Curated annotation (Swiss-Prot):
Species in which this protein is naturally found: Danio rerio (Zebrafish)
UniProt-listed PANTHER family: SYNEMBRYN (PTHR12425), SYNEMBRYN-A (PTHR12425:SF4)
Main subcellular localisation: cytoplasm
The name this protein goes by in its record: Chaperone Ric-8A
Keywords of this entry: Chaperone, Cytoplasm, Guanine-nucleotide releasing factor
Gene: ric8a
Record InterPro entries: ARM-like, ARM-type_fold, Chaperone_Ric-8_A/B, Gua_nucleotide_exch_fac_Ric8
Length: 548
């Protein structure tokens, strides 16, 4: 039906005529996501008429048709102005059942109308800053929080719950003030933890130990249903928004208890599966992202459950969750695409867990850096997890290579000699330079004094290992053998002049280790002086060796 014809029907004010026209339009445009240019004014006019209808006492079918039309029209960013006003948002919020003190909510709400209004709000809030501001002013988050509290009430179906959560995610992602309101005023972490609890159907055998109700003691849980998985992922995304800065600030005792309670539920998330591998990985990804936001001391809940039959035990501690996190990290590492977005959350989480929890660090070290036996290959060669991580230490992305190096450095208890042993000096140089550790030593850290037991193979090969490459190298002939002192000096100065030229042309920048252990630039005269000094020392050592 022509847009002008629909507008004419709406302008008559007749509810039946409007219903027929809108139902026809909605059917024709149900899959329309791009709109004809030049009709913006007509679409805006239709939007205004539909909103005016929604202010009247309409039969449910007409309400639903009006909201469906708004949902379709709100896909067009160029025709949003009728819907982004405070008054329009008020109308839609009321139809979504989220209004604050505006009339009585019916005893039996029309769920179809509520869901359609929520879909409209999602589109409009996503596409319009003015609508976001209006939503904040109208206390939309308060209405959403009130309904989130009813997470165990049977009257709300999946669609209402899901779009409540989707709208909450959007408004907290787009408005910092609403995010803060949910986090603090509305006690968002507790509220959303309860929603997670209800969605999973959890029971609590102990204070920070979680089980699925009806499956307590089962070694393998059934996959979470599709609808429950969708809601869980929305909740995890909202929690990520509201906890974004929590790992960077001090939390009091009450907050720590709240985060530990959430952490216990997140442990259950990471140990659960969804219907299909792709869905499971997506749920685990959101869980890992959120775990990275939790205050570090609260991550101890990952290790709290009792060791049961079939559990991975290490030093008397249940390592099931840590094992799953390592497997998740390695899967992302093997995939190799978008490493910064996909790998770093899990790698950072494991790094910080290892830094603060001795049992986790020792378990991870046993998995990633087992006693060294392979001394013939470079540390970056091979398919072991250590080899894969060492390869990342020279990755083109600075964040990726830094995180990989930091993880291995922490597993080495921030000992420079141990770090070089497992990675080779050439791979380790970047992190050591950044930390001011080029002269060796150890970063100050709180690590226990356990032994680094060397294998027989490593002890035998150690004197022959090239510290730069991290492997035993075949003996190479001395290229200066047979040269006179004058020839050696000539070759040395030739090399210095080549470096000098490259430096002046800013192709390279010669560096030296400063007094603080960090790298600093070398001036050309320093390079010449160093070469002369080294050559002089070489001559002296040759003279000494010739003396009887």
């Amino acid at each position: 039906m022509d847009l002008n014809a629909i507008i004419e029907k709406m302008e008559t004010g007749d509810q039946d005529a409007a219903l027929t026209a809108l139902q026809t339009y909605n059917k024709e445009k149900s899959q329309c996501f791009s709109f004809t240019s030049g009709e913006e004014e007509d679409r805006e006019r239709l939007g205004e008429l539909v909103l005016s209808f929604l202010e009247r006492d309409l039969q449910p079918s007409c309400q639903l048709a009006c909201l469906e039309t708004i949902r379709i029209l709100s896909r067009d960013k160029k025709s949003l102005s009728p819907f982004a006003t405070r008054h329009a948002m008020q109308i839609l919020i009321r139809h979504a059942g989220l209004g604050q003190g505006e009339g009585v909510t019916p005893e039996i709400p029309d769920l179809e109308v509520i869901v359609e209004a929520l879909k409209c709000l999602c589109n409009i809030v996503f596409n319009s800053e003015a609508a976001q501001e209006a939503a904040a002013d109208l206390q939309l988050m308060v209405g959403l929080a009130e309904r989130l509290k009813q997470c165990r009430e049977p009257q709300w179906n999946h669609d209402v719950r899901f779009f409540d959560l989707r709208l909450t995610f959007l408004i907290t992602a787009l408005r910092v003030d609403v995010r803060a309101q949910l986090a603090h005023e509305l006690r968002g972490v507790s509220l959303l933890s309860e929603a997670l609890d209800a969605t999973f159907g959890l029971c609590w055998p102990d204070m920070y130990e979680v089980a699925r109700a009806g499956f307590d003691g089962c070694s393998e849980l059934p996959p979470l249903g599709r609808q429950e998985t969708e809601r869980v992922m929305e909740i995890l995304k909202i929690l990520f928004n509201v906890t974004f800065d929590s790992n960077r600030r001090h939390v009091d005792e009450e907050e720590a208890a709240t985060y530990r309670h959430l952490g216990a539920i997140l442990r259950h998330c990471i140990m659960s599966s969804a219907e299909g591998e792709e869905r499971t990985e997506e749920m685990h990804s959101h869980t890992v992202n959120l775990l990275g936001n939790l205050p570090l001391p609260c991550l101890d809940v990952l290790l709290m459950p009792k060791v049961q039959q079939g559990s991975i035990e290490y030093m008397g501690v249940n390592m099931d969750a840590v094992k799953v996190l390592v497997e998740f990290m390695e899967k992302r590492l093997d995939r190799g695409n978008k490493l910064k977005e996909t790998l770093l959350p899990s790698l950072n989480l494991l790094t910080e867990s290892a830094r603060i929890h001795r049992e986790t660090r020792k378990f991870l070290r046993n998995k990633v850096l087992p006693p060294l036996r392979d001394v013939k290959n470079r540390p970056e060669v091979g398919n072991a997890l250590r080899n894969k991580l060492v390869r990342l230490m020279t990755h083109i992305d600075t964040d990726v290579k830094h995180c990989a190096a930091e993880f291995l450095f922490v597993l080495c208890k921030e000992s420079v000699s141990r770090f070089i042993k497992y990675t080779g000096y050439g791979n380790a140089a970047g992190l050591l330079a950044a930390r001011g550790l080029m002269r060796g030593g150890r970063d100050p850290g709180h690590y226990s004094e356990d032994e680094d037991s060397d294998t027989e193979e490593y002890r035998e090969a150690k004197p022959h290992i090239n510290p730069v490459t991290g492997r035993v190298e075949e003996e190479q002939p001395n290229p200066m053998e047979g040269m006179t002192d004058e020839q050696k000096e000539y070759e040395a100065m030739k090399l210095v002049n080549m470096f000098d030229k490259l430096s002046r042309e800013q192709v390279i920048q010669p560096m030296k280790i400063g007094a603080d252990g960090k790298m600093t630039s070398m001036e050309p005269h320093e390079l010449h002086h160093l070469a002369s000094q080294q050559f002089g020392e070489s001559n002296n050592s040759d003279s000494d060796s010739d003396t009887n």
